[in-house]
């Protein structure tokens, strides 16, 4: 059983998630994006170590399948929001970078 303090903290946490969801919907609509496209761009620009991400990292952050994330990346490429580059360090990996248009979105 949760304590009162834990329940209050959980309630506040869920409230902040709901506020972020509302903000995300408004931000994605303002940019002409789907919410998932917006979140993917956010995860690329917000990567803690660099300004690009792999499809696997994006799938993990989005809590989506790698296959579904690859399809999302391809749709965003068609919209000129992102570009894929083969990794110089490891040719098996593909880096997903924001384009200028993706940065503006």
Which residues make up each language-model segment?
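N-terminal leader segment of winged-helix/HTH proteins
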Residues: 1-31
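N-terminal helix-turn-helix DNA-binding core of bacterial DNA-binding proteins
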Residues: 23-65
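Canonical helix-turn-helix DNA-binding module
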Residues: 50-100
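Pre-recognition alpha-helix immediately N-terminal to the DNA-recognition helix
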Residues: 12, 19, 39-43, 104
